[in-house]
């Protein structure tokens, strides 16, 4: 059955809906195509019925049938916190992220983010610089580092853990990033937003985290730069001024 899940994931480029429909209608496996597709795999992978599949993900909406990865899935056995925010972040957002991530990894927490430009990249780099651990969840194929500016970071993160539900060189699509965010939320026991706009991918991730019953933390910001964080705090997110505000929960 694992081979069947892998086959349809490769054939349909990791798209949950297409894989689901193929399984539902009991689509036949083309053995010749299967052999061809399997030969393209460069990374490790796990399926939803495998023993090493991340347990937390089994309980989210539309859990990926297959996860492709580089690095060690055992990182997910530790307490994980999602650290997310704006792509076009301010110096304040960068500083807040660095300080909080440094303190979080000192406490043994693993930083989960999306390797995007801005806050995501700051979170990953700070974790690495602080001798901590970090997990990247991609919105592109596992062998397609995106954005290109983070290629060097991608290479470093291969020694930590990089995950994608999209195989090989599947290029990013606009709708892949919101879907990626459900995995970030699913792998994280807590979610920290350090800077955000009201309408953003960050807020989509927050929605997934709340749907999954996770605690959401937000760093307050200026009304011009971080309306999303301030709005979250108004709605009940836990205000963060130091790492203690997160660890106490």
State where each predicted segment sits.
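Short, small/acidic-rich helices and loops at N termini and domain boundaries
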Residues: 1-52
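Glycine-biased, small-residue-rich flexible motifs in mid-sequence functional cores and linkers
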Residues: 48-249
